[in-house]
Regions:
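N-terminal hydrophobic/helix-forming segments and targeting peptides
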Residues: 1-354
Length: 354
């Protein structure tokens, strides 16, 4: 992957966007989408919607969510220690010792999530996950007044982890769930823009907000866009590391290619068109059977208005909802290519009735 594109992914990661506070990353996305689309707008919830060939049919929505996990400052004690609420689904055991950035109007403040040292834990506390009430953020001050000069109640914070390269095609960062998905859909739009003379469908890009707290942005944006077809891009678990079971979650691997979901939330014709596009492009893929809900924006998009023909493409990801999520740039590139080829195959005669 070109370094300039990796740099754009880095910009997405560097723009904090806890659920409900996505404005900074959405500004980065708006600026990028002006290069590849004919129209751009932001709705009342903060979803960024950008259209390429907007008057054509069928209308297809390509979406990923831009929000990430985060923290919300709730209280500062007399010694300047900061207590917080979590935004999204954290495993509390991953938090003690984590460095965080508290984002303020004057800039970011570095802090550390503190907890009583292991040496001081009582016997009944050892081996148990810590409670949020037993943790705080330490920014290195001595008094409440010092902390208040730097941090306001209601400030947001994110883990301080940034994008770094691992071996081969792998990268590690916080918030790859789902900024890697946003990046993938932007890449697909960039490729479609470069081939717009072949494009017959109207394509609506959506960078959706508030997925981590209830799939909210996808719910409202799908109603507004009113697509016939929608494909969401998110991350999914892998079974290629210790303490996971292929029997429970299937055989999903990093560098194994796009993960294509099948199940009750997935339109069977859209599923087959994604398979066909992958086969024609020579892209290896992985199948993820979803017996009930997918836990992604697909679930609410499917039942928008009179119904939407939905598909779900997933990026294999290790260690979800930690500060060290791992994905493959190769998988991302292949999903972007698959998505663009899928869209180019759509026309006014496309039938999605099961």
């Amino acid at each position: 992957m070109e370094e300039s594109r990796i740099a754009f992914l880095q910009r997405l990661i560097n723009s904090p966007s806890p659920s409900g506070f996505e404005q900074r990353v959405q500004q980065v996305i708006r600026e990028e989408m002006q290069l590849y689309t004919d129209e751009q707008r932001t709705d009342v919830h903060g979803n960024v919607i950008a259209a390429l060939n907007p008057n054509a049919n069928p209308r297809v929505m390509l979406t990923a969510h831009c929000d990430e996990l985060g923290f919300l400052v709730r209280f500062i004690d007399e010694k300047g220690f900061i207590y917080f609420a979590t935004i999204g689904g954290f495993d509390p055991s991953t938090l003690p010792g984590e460095r965080v950035q508290i984002h303020t109007a004057k800039g970011s403040i570095l802090g550390v999530i503190g907890r009583k040292p292991v040496h001081l834990l009582q016997s009944d506390e050892r081996g148990k996950a810590p409670k949020l009430s037993e943790m705080w953020i330490d920014i290195g001050v001595n008094h409440k007044e010092e902390a208040q000069e730097l941090v306001a109640i209601g400030s947001i914070a994110t883990r301080a982890a940034q994008l770094e390269k691992l071996h081969g095609d792998l990268v590690v960062s916080r918030a790859l769930d789902d900024k890697s998905g946003v990046f993938t859909v932007v890449e697909a739009m960039r490729r479609l823009h470069g081939q717009r003379e072949k494009l017959k469908a109207g394509v609506f890009f959506v960078s959706a907000v508030q997925e981590e707290v209830g799939l909210r942005g996808a719910h409202t944006s799908a109603f507004g866009v009113d697509p016939l077809i929608a494909v969401a891009v998110d991350v999914t678990f892998t079974s290629d590391h210790p303490q996971t079971s292929k029997h429970e979650i299937g055989d999903i691997r990093l560098n194994g290619g796009p993960v294509i979901s099948i199940g009750g939330r997935i339109n069977p014709r859209v599923y087959q068109m994604l398979i066909d596009a992958a086969d024609e492009a020579g892209i290896a893929y992985q199948i993820d059977p979803q017996a009930s809900g997918t836990g992604t924006d697909t679930d609410v998009i499917q039942v928008s208005r009179a119904g939407v023909a939905t598909g779900l493409l997933s990026i294999p990801c290790r260690y979800l909802h930690t500060g060290s999520e791992i994905v493959s740039l190769k998988d991302i590139d292949e999903i972007a290519e698959l998505l663009s080829r899928f869209v180019l195959a759509l026309d006014a005669q496309t039938n999605v009735i099961p």
